Amino acid sequence: NICFAKNAPLRDEYDRLFASAFENPDYIKAIVNLLGTKNAGYTRAEILEKLDISDGETFTKSLKALLASDFIVKYYPFGLSKRSVHYKLVDSFCIFYHHFMKDLKTTNEKFWQQNNTSQSLSSWRGFAFENVCFSHVEQCKKALGISGVVTQTSAWSKRPDDEEGTQIDLLIILFLYTYR
């Protein structure tokens, strides 16, 4: 078992990954750890507030490094202003780590088999599929036959008070231009 056994090879991989990939691994991990708590991600202002850090060059460089290395994506939630850009964690290993390994107190080599039909694993599969789509928008557009069309990628959700909500995980908004 590569994740859940006592000496599993990937048990400490999360920390090693950040230490080897980034100059300031603890700072970067704090951002990723926060983004791992909410599938829709957070705005820049929300990240700064929740982590109680200042806006500046270190934060900006950290976001750029995470974007460039495909750990996160930046998107504009449908129906909101351009100022409400969200940053969303899409790295598959990091998402898996946050859902299943981060708070794991014990080792259980049969974890996956014993939890295969659990609600937690079912929810994670949905999030994982959504993130695969978000990470491969160009391939999705090609499969849909719209690879040459200018688009914007977004997500949308609506949750009225005291009611169940509605959510669309991936919107591909087409920009069609007419020339006169």
Mark where each language-model region is.
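Accessory nucleic acid-recognition modules appended to NTPase machines
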Residues: 2-170
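Active-site beta-strand-loop-beta-strand hairpin of nuclease catalytic cores
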Residues: 172-180
